[in-house]
Amino acid sequence: MGQELSQHERYVEQLKQALKTRGVKVKYADLLKFFDFVKDTCPWFPQEGTIDIKRWRRVGDCFQDYYNTFGPEKVPVTAFSYWNLIKELIDKKEVNPQVMAAVAQTEEILKSNSQTDLTKTSQNPDLDLISLDSDDEGAKSSSLQDKGLSSTKKPKRFPVLLTAQTSKDPEDPNPSEVDWDGLEDEAAKYHNPDWPPFLTRPPPYNKATPSAPTVMAVVNPKEELKEKIAQLEEQIKLEELHQALISKLQKLKTGNETVTHPDTAGGLSRTPHWPGQHIPKGKCCASREKEEQIPKDIFPVTETVDGQGQAWRHHNGFDFAVIKELKTAASQYGATAPYTLAIVESVADNWLTPTDWNTLVRAVLSGGDHLLWKSEFFENCRDTAKRNQQAGNGWDFDMLTGSGNYSSTDAQMQYDPGLFAQIQAAATKAWRKLPVKGDPGASLTGVKQGPDEPFADFVHRLITTAGRIFGSAEAGVDYVKQLAYENANPACQAAIRPYRKKTDLTGYIRLCSDIGPSYQQGLAMAAAFSGQTVKDFLNNKNKEKGGCCFKCGKKGHFAKNCHEHAHNNAEPKVPGLCPRCKRGKHWANECKSKTDNQGNPIPPHQGNGWRGQPQAPKQAYGAVSFVPANKNNPFQSLPEPPQEVQDWTSVPPPTQY
């Protein structure tokens, strides 16, 4: 018995070193459950007596069939992980002599007796890494009694792959006399094609006894349940630690205290699985720090994969910057604006449960819009449920709306990806049915250029806002051009005004490219020196080139536009008594009297006065008639006497002509 125990310890130590080379730490309780599961699903495996990749894949196929038939509840959570671990050991046994020796030794044990009674009790707790139990529980119980072991310890069960040599084989040598180098050479013969094949007869089958042991050790259900609980608690602790480390790493990289997607940053994000992929799924707990900071009602569902290939679903926090941007867009541009719908579609790419959608809409939209969206969403879910019923699909109205038996978040997290897609389609369709409220263009008219803001930046903000409202800036280019002039600062308006109807928006930008802070500062100083505002100074700047007003003498306007003419124009002076004639109230230069009020003649005006029309003289002075008086003259028809010769005289010239 001492030799058997020493041989077993040496084999366990060898297997421990083989696993250590792979960097894997195996637990006793997990491996024990795995061996029990292999025994239940594959009772033929220990009877064949050969361990190769082909037979081990048959074991994996049995696992998959068992999983498809009974579901994930009947399969241990570590079954597939340990199967992959042992598969890697079998694949690497040709390059690792230590693994090759362990596999060869196990094959010898299986060939010698498939129902060997072995005990595994290690005095050193550090060596208690892998369960190596026997299929014969009755023989095992007797061996335990012979060794004087305590009956309170749980009896061991059947080893699947890695077993120690039996103590009942009379041909087993002493472990101290075993040539381990020779054993490695013998194990290498199994896979060397140049050597002759190593043929052995298969172990005889005992038809009188069944393949599985008839007498099983009594297992306490409470103890087994406690082991499962302890295993789950340890899994939860490791997952929490994993999430906390990823969150801390993200904070160190970005310097931001709020970590939106730690799984993505840590490289653990996974593409969503489509229906039909048989992967065990569960829910892992999030970090306690996140639970205190962010409520659980507004998280999308994400799925991550741990190091063992298991998928876990949990809630991951929204990026609150996206939610804030969505609320701002819905308030400024409207719930159905193209920019707002683009944000909604980006958020809808996640797996959102009906509770998540309801919470998101209630936080972003007003109370009335939330009720409108909810009514449209329920109507869309009814139509989708009818189509699912006609197609034979079990996704009903309660699952789509998250009501009834599916009102809890835990139940909604386990939805299939196809169901999440139907919920997304119904929610986004209901969002598009929301009515347009207010004037969307009001936010566009509120975009004004700052005093020191470059005109190009102002136009960019204007075009961006127009694109969010109209869907494309080209749709409202004329409206944008008008607002680019009206909402510009006075300096840019003065530069654009002469060319306003001669160029387009790009011309506006080119005209205002030189207007910057220094130009604005000089313009303000010039306006202050002239005693005018900047706007008045720019309006009067081009008018000063026309000269001064002829009436008031000031610059900036003409005489016809002079506002001071009406104030300075006094009433006309009334003439008094005429100084020449003393008989009327009129100006002296307008007096036409010949005599004054005493009857004395008034001398004529000296100098050039107002002249009338010239008149012909009534009498010819100094003229001599040379026509003789002749009665036969045909031109003389007037019966008047002929004129006499007149003398020359001197008279003053007429005063007027």
Curated annotation (Swiss-Prot):
Cellular component, GO, one term: host cell cytoplasm
Residue numbers with lipid attached (N-myristoyl glycine): G2
Zinc finger (CCHC-type): 547-564, 576-593
Compositional bias ranges of the Polar residues kind: 113-125, 140-152
Coiled coil regions, renumbered to chain: 216-257
SMART domains on file: ZnF_C2HC (SM00343)
Gene3D superfamilies noted in UniProt: 1.10.1200.30, Human Immunodeficiency Virus Type 1 Capsid Protein, Retroviral GAG p10 protein, Zinc finger, CCHC-type
A Pfam match: Gag_p24
Domain of life: Viruses
UniProt KW Endoplasmic reticulum keyword: no
UniProt propeptide residues: 101-161
InterPro entries: B_retro_matrix (IPR003322), B_retro_matrix_sf (IPR038124), Gag_p24_C (IPR045345), Primate_lentivir_Gag_pol-like (IPR050195), Retrov_capsid_C (IPR008916), Retrov_capsid_N (IPR008919), Retrovr_matrix (IPR010999), Znf_CCHC (IPR001878)
Site (Cleavage): M100, A101, L162, T163, M216, A217, F299, P300, M525, A526, Y621, G622
GO biological process, any: viral budding via host ESCRT complex
The entry's keywords: Capsid protein, Coiled coil, Host-virus interaction, Lipoprotein, Metal-binding, Myristate, Phosphoprotein, Repeat, Viral budding, Viral budding via the host ESCRT complexes, Viral matrix protein, Viral nucleoprotein, Viral release from host cell, Virion, Zinc, Zinc-finger
Molecular function as annotated in GO: metal ion binding; nucleic acid binding; structural constituent of virion; zinc ion binding
Motif PTAP/PSAP motif: where in chain: 210-213
Region of interest (Disordered), residue spans: 113-178, 592-657
Ranges spanned by the short sequence motif PPXY motif, renumbered to the chain: 202-205
Protein name: Gag polyprotein
Protein species of origin: Mason-Pfizer monkey virus
Source lineage: Viruses, Riboviria, Pararnavirae, Artverviricota, Revtraviricetes
